[in-house]
Amino acid sequence: NGLGLMLLGVTGNEVLPADVYAQIKADALSKVRGTVQADILKEDQAQNTCIFSTEFALRLMGDVQEYFIEKNVRNFYSVSISGYHIAEAGANPISQLAFTLANGFTFVEYYLSRGMDINKFGPNLSFFFSNGVDPEYAVIGRVARKIWSKAMKMKYGADPRAQMLKYHIQTSGRSLHAQEIDFNDIRTTLQALYAIYDNCNSLHTNAYDEAITTPTEESVRRAMAIQLIINKELG
């Protein structure tokens, strides 16, 4: 208990009995939290930083998901199905959501074609949306959840846990102005409020100077302060 995986390297002398090591490793894999963003479809559609072909990347994504199922990795997301990059490339809120959900269902169909159980891989899927100041962003999360849960239940027969859509919000980089950058914190605060009132699972607030440079320590502290003040002082 309490021994991290990083301490369990192979040496000339056995540190722990093999069965104890195997149990610690299995427990760690079942509890560890994190996200693999590797969404190849948003790369093709928006970000364009593809290293591998779409077909090969999909196969790798499927391999990761199969490993997660085999090793009972239940709390780590195998993919972050990303609309943020699509929005940054110019999509409005409605188009962002449409492309992102379509990509999500593409992954579902592909994993099913490889013989995976939807109730085993459904909980490993997560989403990533942008929030701008357009009014549709006030409801993007709840609309996404309603569409996703209905399709997962009625089309694919998923259980309640696999029907749940978990999503991260990052405030819109595209909305930041290069002139009078100090006012960007106001834009980011409004976007953060949209996200919180729409019940996002996690939130990233952009630094006000990202329109012109790599964020500084001061601007990042201000971006973090937006979240902290909303969380601790609002309401």
Placement of each model-derived feature along the sequence:
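Short glycine/threonine-rich loop-to-helix capping motif typified by GTGT followed
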Residues: 89-98, 132-143, 171-185, 213-222
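Short, acidic/polar
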Residues: 185-192
